[in-house]
């Protein structure tokens, strides 16, 4: 099994390799494949039931598992979810490695992995993983207000 310290730079290098061989569109196709095979089974099931509230339930679990420094809010009266990643462990690790040049759109995989699934179930993307520099980003969705299952 590969450790996360090895996986993250390998993932970044893979994106670079795919783009050099087949172009940027091939990288996006790769991300779509990852979305369908790995992200959809978890996020899709939650979003089908909870709509925009799935954002809270999904990321409150996954971001804590990754030990990310983040702040997120969800208003179950207005259906507005907002998140600020103050420090993404993946991007941060890449930026700290002196021997690695991060793939130029490394953070782009988040836009492709998550927003399309949430939008299928009524969440509207207001800010799709806008990179803010220094391993941070912001994203926001709104939709029909529903309570979260794991407050």
Feature names for model-found ranges:
Residues 1-108, 119, 124-138, 143-151:
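N-terminal accessory segment detector
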Residues 113-114:
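Short amphipathic alpha-helical segments
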């Amino acid at each position: 099994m590969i450790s996360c310290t090895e996986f993250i730079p390998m993932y970044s290098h893979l994106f670079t390799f795919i783009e050099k061989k087949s172009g940027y569109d091939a990288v996006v196709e790769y991300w779509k494949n990852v979305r369908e095979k790995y992200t959809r089974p978890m996020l899709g099931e939650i979003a089908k039931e909870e709509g925009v509230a799935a954002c809270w339930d999904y990321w409150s679990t996954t971001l804590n598992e990754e030990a990310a420094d983040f702040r997120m809010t969800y208003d179950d009266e207005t259906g507005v979810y907002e998140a600020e990643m103050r420090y993404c462990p993946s991007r941060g690790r890449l930026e700290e490695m002196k021997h690695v040049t991060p793939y130029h759109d490394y953070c782009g995989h988040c836009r492709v992995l998550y927003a399309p699934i949430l939008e299928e179930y009524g969440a509207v993307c207001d800010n799709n993983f806008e990179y803010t520099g220094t391993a941070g980003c912001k994203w926001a969705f709104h939709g029909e207000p529903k309570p979260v299952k794991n407050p």
